[in-house]
UniProtKB/Swiss-Prot annotation:
GO biological process: L-lyxose metabolic process; rhamnose catabolic process
Keywords, ordered alphabetically: Cytoplasm, Isomerase, Manganese, Metal-binding, Rhamnose metabolism
Binding-site residues, Mn(2+): 264, 296, 298
GO cellular component: cytoplasm
Protein name (record): L-rhamnose isomerase
Length: 420
């Protein structure tokens, strides 16, 4: 009996078990296939980019490790991404930062244009991918005194305002060329190391600068903007201008998506608990699925409680339609392609786990105060053959099942990465 027959056979058994509790596995698999994950380019080169790859990584973030094989050119990065996507079921998106320009021109962040990203667009067309975007408000000499858009220096603010405006045009270009809405996410690391006297004025400057960046109305068929908060970063421990409250207020009043990064809050605070509230009041959500270990460490996403809870919240509350799921982690201590594959597949698995729940029945039990049945069923579900459904999903989408993907990554490492 071949592996394919065995996987299909095990799936049929699992299908019947789920059917017995009212879950349609075929419907779950169809829904999962339609969910695009926005995989981040910066895992592939440790957030160096191609604008100034030898420059310092600033903005209060840090990539640690020196595992061999990091990409040094756009061509190498695309080659690595192709390998990763070939091991992940479904068709997805790539999330680009502005520093990942692909051009022979000497260009600065306040000069970037769509043409500097044309090779990415042509490649995305060939691969059947969408593209999301991020202006890069860090790793640049104009990141002065820990400030960009909130700087008291008008010259600094104006530089970054221009960068933000140009980023919007690039995101719009992606959407027009690829026929998929490009999400353009604004994260600004501005902050202060020690306790400030004036918390209000920098936030007012940031608000006014963002208003100027977003002044021109763009067609949301092509691009939508998200704004991302953060609690603190290295060198900005006491105060971050773009706090959660700031961007929640800004996003709701300016009709922007609100980006929630799993690592950008207090260590005991989780973004899964925020989704239902934001869904009531905001236009929609951009997720940066990450794994904070004691701080915003951007560890690779594993199948932990919070990832499972994020999947549940999105599915149980029917939020998939207003949520854009992206990843944000960068670990230079392990094979970078493996990092992409593990993180993306785990995010998909968390969604599948949630899609395999009898959600309507569980909600009915809860409404009727039948908490006994609710507990019994949710606990029993933990032992259901979820893995057999996932393996079948991988098989029908033509990607390796189980750990077979690791063999391919190891071979690629030997043949390609270790020769760089």
């Amino acid at each position: 009996m071949g592996q394919e027959t065995e996987i299909s056979k095990r799936y049929q058994v699992a299908k019947e078990r789920y059917q017995a509790i009212g879950v349609d596995t075929e419907k779950a698999l169809k829904t999962l296939k339609d969910i695009k994950i926005s995989m981040h380019c910066w895992q592939g080169d440790d957030v160096k980019g191609f604008l100034n790859p030898d420059g310092e990584l600033t903005g209060g973030i840090m990539a640690t490790g020196n595992y061999p094989g990091a990409a040094h050119t756009p061509k190498q990065l695309r080659q690595d991404l192709e390998k990763a996507y070939s091991l992940i079921p479904g068709k997805h998106k790539l999330n680009l930062h502005a520093i990942y320009v692909d051009t022979d021109e000497k260009v600065d962040l306040n000069e970037i244009e769509p043409k500097h990203f044309t090779p990415w667009v042509e490649w995305a067309k060939e691969q059947g991918l969408g593209l999301d975007f991020n202006p890069t408000f860090f790793s640049h000499p104009m990141f002065k005194d820990n400030y960009t858009l909130a700087s008291p220096d008008k010259e600094v603010r104006d530089f970054w305002i221009e960068h933000g405006k140009r980023s919007r045009k690039i995101s719009e270009y992606f959407g027009k060329e690829l026929g998929q809405t490009s999400i353009n996410n604004f994260w600004v690391p501005d902050g202060i190391k020690d306790c400030p006297i004036d918390r209000y004025t920098p936030r007012k400057r940031l608000m006014e600068a963002l208003d100027e960046v977003f002044a021109e109305k763009l067609d949301e068929k092509y691009t939508q903007e998200a704004v991302e908060s953060k609690l603190f970063g290295l060198g900005a421990e006491a105060y971050t201008v773009g706090s959660h409250e700031f961007y929640m207020g800004y996003g709701i009043t300016r009709d922007k998506l609100i980006c929630l990064d799993a690592g950008h809050f207090h260590p005991t605070e989780v973004i899964s608990n925020k989704l239902s509230s934001l869904a009531l009041f905001s236009k929609g959500v951009m997720l940066h699925v990450s794994r904070p270990v004691r701080w915003d460490s951007d560890h690779v996403v594993i199948m932990d409680d919070e990832l499972i809870e994020i999947g549940r919240e999105l599915v149980r509350n029917d939020l998939l339609g207003i949520t854009n799921i992206g990843l944000d982690f960068f670990d230079a201590t392990i094979n970078r392609i493996a990092a992409w594959v593990v993180g993306t597949r785990n995010t998909q698995k968390s969604l599948l786990k949630a899609l395999l729940e009898p959600t309507a029945d569980l909600k009915k039990m809860e409404l009727e105060n039948d908490f006994t049945s609710r507990m019994a069923i949710t606990e029993e579900l933990k032992d259901f053959p979820f893995g057999d459904v996932w393996n079948y999903f991988c098989e029908i989408n033509g990607v390796p099942v189980g750990l077979d993907w690791l063999k391919e990554v190891k071979a690629y490492e030997k043949d390609v990465l270790l020769k760089r």
